[in-house]
Amino acid sequence: MKEAQNAAVELLQQGEVVALPTETVYGLAADAFNPAAVAKIFAAKERPDFDPLIVHIATVRDLERVAIVPEDIRHTLNQLTTEFWPGPLTVILPKTPEVPDLVTSGLSTVGVRQSGHPIFRAINKALGNPIAAPSANRFGRISPTSASAVMKELGGRIPLIVDAGACSEGVESTIIRIEPREGKKPIFHLHRAGPISKEQLQKFGKVQAVKPGDKLQSPGQLESHYAPLTPFRLIEKPSDFTPELGKRYGLLSYTGEEGGEFVRMHRWENVVALSPGSGKLAEAAVRLFYVMREMDEMGLDEIIAEPVSEVGLGVAIMDRLRRASAR
C-alpha cells in the first residue's frame, strides 16, 4: 500500500489525477492549487464546469490556506471541526484567492473538509497542498464505493486507482453553510444530507434544508444524480406501482423481508436488500451504491426502490434515491 501511496503523491505532484479511497466514496483527486490538474477532473468525469468541487485538507491548520473564517462563526466552526473532523462533514466558507475559480465554479465560496480516511489523509499531507476530489465516477452516475467500481467508471481515463477496499460510510459527506445569529444558536443551511445527521448537528445549531436555486451553491444539488443506466423509480407506497405486461422489474428493498408489503406486491425478477433482515440504516447507507450498481447489471427493464424511514442516515439515503429517480 505504501508503494501505491507514493505513486499517488508523485502523480499528483506532476499535475495528474488519481482515484483515492475516502470514508464516504472513492474520490477523483487533483492538486487543488493546480488549475490544469483540476481541469483533468472535469474532463475524466465529463463533469460540467458549473458544478463546484470539495477541497480536502490534511490538517485543521491548513483550513486558512483555502478559506477565510469570519469571526462571527469561528467559535461554531471550531465546535464542528472538533466534533466531526476528520470526517464526513463539509463546510462552505468564503474562499481565499489561492483557490482557483475552476474549483468553485466561479463562486466566492468553497466547500472544505478533512477526510477521515487515513490513506487519503496521508497522501494529502505528503502532497503538501489541498486536494480537490469529487466522486470518482462519470458525471451523474452511481458513486463508487470500491476500487472495482472506479475501474468500471474511469478505467483507461486515469493513471492510478489506489485500492483500500470498501468505503466505511457509503454516501457522500454532509454539506452545510453556517449563518450566525446574535444571541442565538447559528443556523446550519443543509446543502446535502450525508453521514453526519441533522440530529447530530442540532447539538450546535438549528438545521434548515436548502432548496436548490438557479445557480449551484455546492456539489450534490442537481435534481438528477447518482443514477444507474437502467430506468430507476422510487415509489413512496405500493399503490403507486402499476407494472407493465412483459417488463422485468427488480425491487431495491430496505430489508427484503418476504412478508413486507413492497416485496409481496409483485412477482419481482430480483429483490435485493440494503440491510437484509435487520433494517439498519448504517448498513443500508454503506450498501446503497453497491446494490444500485449490482442491480444495474441485471438486465432489468426498470428498478423500483422502496423508501426508508427519514430519520438519521435515512435522510441521506432518501436524498440519493430521489435524485437517482429524477429524469
Label the model's feature ranges.
Residues 1-327:
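Active-site-adjacent structural elements in enzyme catalytic cores
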